[in-house]
Every structure is written in structure tokens, then in C-alpha cells.
Amino acid sequence: ILDDYNRESLSINISYSFPSEKVIEIVEQVIEWRGKPESIRTDNGTEFIAHAFTNFCIREKIEHIKIQKGKPTQNSYIERFNRSYREDVLDAYIFEDLNQVRKATEIFMDDYNNEHPHESLGDKSPIEFLNAVNCGKLTAQSTHTSLPQLTAIH
């Protein structure tokens, strides 16, 4: 899960399958940690179009924005993130088991969130940007105008 506001990677689930129930569990964990988003943008994967996920969004009053089929540019933040993750983790190593993938993913997320500058964030990392906004050194509007929103990894 990627936060559109500051491009922070909030969760990456490493598993052989990703049913809607697991998606809901992960989103609930993120909500408990960071608060409820106004919306969640996803592709049209089966885990996101399932009744369970749709009902969860309705129950939680979270707008579920589904990108149009064949239009990955409507989900550009996550597409770019997935590319970085694929290049830096999945394509960079040969893993023997999922635990090794999880460990490499933890290291990647820490680096991405704390060290990786984003042009759209004034060349700050996601955490640097969030800290600057929270300390009053920046206003969110001075850098971008996105509404708080989560983008789900597909």
C-alpha cells in the first residue's frame, strides 16, 4: 500500500496468494496505524473487485476508485513504485524462501521511505516530507495538492 500524499510505502504483503480478506486485514492495520483514508485507488484485480472488499469500503465510508482497464497511468504512483521494488528487490536477488523476500522488502521499504528523494516532494524522501509538513516547515499545498489517499499494490 502506498500513501499518495507523501508516497510512503505503508505495507507490502509477501505471499503466494492475495485474497480480498487479506487485503481487508492489511488495510485495517494501516487504518489503525495511520487513520482512515478518504479513498483507495486500485486496479481491477479480483481481490479488489470482490464483494468482500467492496462491502468493506462501503462500511468504512472509503471511496473505492478503480482505474480503467488497460490504463495503468491512472495508477502511476504505484506503477512507478512497483517498478522500483521489482528492480531493487525481486530482480536483484535469488531467494530461497518467502522469509528472505520479506527481509529484503523490509530493508527496501526503510530505504525507500527514509532515503529515496521524490521530485514531487521537493526532492525529499516520504518521511522527510511528512516531518517537514508536520513541523510546519512546509505546507502540503506548497508541494502538491493530492487528497489523502491510499493506492493498493497489485
Regions found by a protein language model. Give the residues of each.
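Short, acidic, Ser/Thr-enriched surface-loop or helix-capping motifs
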Residues: 3-4
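Hydrophobic "anchor" residues
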Residues: 8-9
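Short catalytic-loop micro-motif centered on adjacent basic/acidic residues
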Residues: 12-13, 39-43
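Active-site beta-loop-alpha junctions of metal-dependent nucleic acid enzymes
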Residues: 12-34
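Alpha-helical structural signal in soluble globular domains
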Residues: 29-30, 52, 56-60
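A structural signal for short coil/turn segments at secondary-structure junctions
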Residues: 34-35, 116
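RNase H-like two-metal-ion nuclease catalytic core shared by retroviral integrases
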Residues: 42-44, 50-55, 64-87, 97-106, ...
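C-terminal domain-tail junction helix/linker
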Residues: 60-62, 87-154
